[in-house]
Each structure stands twice: as C-alpha cells, then as structure tokens.
C-alpha cells in the first residue's frame, strides 16, 4: 500500500524506478568492489599465526571456544582486573557533538567502576552487620495464661 496517491500507474512505476536508482546511487552497477591486495610485504610472524589458526580450525579446534571453556576466564571481575592491569580507563568518547550530548557530563557515580565500588561497600556493610549483631539469639519462655 502506497502512502502517495499517483495520477496514473505509469507515474507510480516511474517513481519506483527513481527510488530504486536513488538507493543504488543512480546506477545499475554497484559502486563497491573488493580492494586489491596491498603492495607492502606481509609480516611473516603474523602470517604464521594466521596459518596456525587456520590449521587448528580445520581440526575442529576453535580459539574462542577454548577461551570460553578456560576456568580463568570465568571470573566476573576479569574485565575490571585486565583494565586495571593495562591501565585502561572507561571509554567515554562519542562522535556526537558536545552541544548535543556530552558523555563526560555525568556524575561520577553513574559509571560502572563507581557502581561496582558502591555494591562492594554495601555487601561489606551487610556482612559486617550480620557478624556483629547476630552473635546470639535471645529466646523468651512462653507463659501460659491463668
């Protein structure tokens, strides 16, 4: 169903052809192609690594699967630990102009690191409360009415 009322079927067909040409860039031939191989020499170490991964894949061994099955990568704090180790800060960049949206204009408590720290503090307070205030449970004897 068209949202435009055309005077004739010919006008509608012409409009559809024009829309299709606009989508294709006003040409029947696409404007993209696979680029030529680079002229520079190939890094031999990189080529060896790629060939090794291709051999492993042919044997049914997939790098991603091996990583996901590795017990060391099941740590929920792994990303935080790696970011700390490599001194990587939280990404706060954007392609949008700052007058429209400034990603650095948030309060520090909205970022993941601050939220994680806040959660850790809450858990510590709860555990501390449970340790110190629940050392004994006081019972009262029941009294029968007379």
From Swiss-Prot:
Sorted alphabetically, the Gene Ontology cellular component annotations on this record are: nucleus
Locations listed in the record: Nucleus
Disordered: annotated span: 1-40
Q: Where is the composition biased (Basic and acidic residues)?
A: 21-32
Q: Which InterPro entries match?
A: SAP30BP
Any idea which UniProt keywords this protein has?
Meiosis, Nucleus
For biological process, the GO terms are:
meiotic cell cycle; negative regulation of gene expression, epigenetic; regulation of DNA-templated transcription
**Highest taxon of the lineage:** Eukaryota
What does UniProt give as the signal peptide span? none
Q: State the protein's purpose.
A: Has a role in meiosis.
What is this protein identified as?
Meiotically up-regulated gene 151 protein
Q: Which organism is it from?
A: Schizosaccharomyces pombe (strain 972 / ATCC 24843) (Fission yeast)
The organism that produces this protein has a lineage beginning with: Eukaryota, Fungi, Dikarya, Ascomycota, Taphrinomycotina
């Amino acid at each position: 169903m068209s949202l435009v009322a055309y005077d004739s079927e010919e006008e509608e067909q012409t409009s559809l052809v024009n829309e299709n040409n606009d989508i294709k860039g006003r040409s029947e031939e696409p404007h993209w192609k696979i680029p030529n191989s680079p002229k520079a020499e190939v890094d031999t170490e990189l080529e060896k690594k790629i060939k090794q991964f291709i051999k492993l894949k042919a044997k049914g061994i997939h790098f991603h699967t091996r990583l996901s099955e590795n017990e060391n990568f099941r740590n929920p704090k792994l990303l935080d630990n790696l970011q700390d180790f490599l001194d990587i800060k939280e990404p706060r960049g954007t392609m949008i102009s700052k007058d429209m949206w400034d990603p650095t204009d948030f309060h520090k408590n909205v970022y993941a690191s601050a939220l994680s720290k806040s959660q850790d503090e809450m858990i510590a307070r709860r555990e501390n409360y449970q340790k110190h205030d629940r050392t004994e449970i006081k019972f009262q004897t029941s009294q029968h009415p007379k």
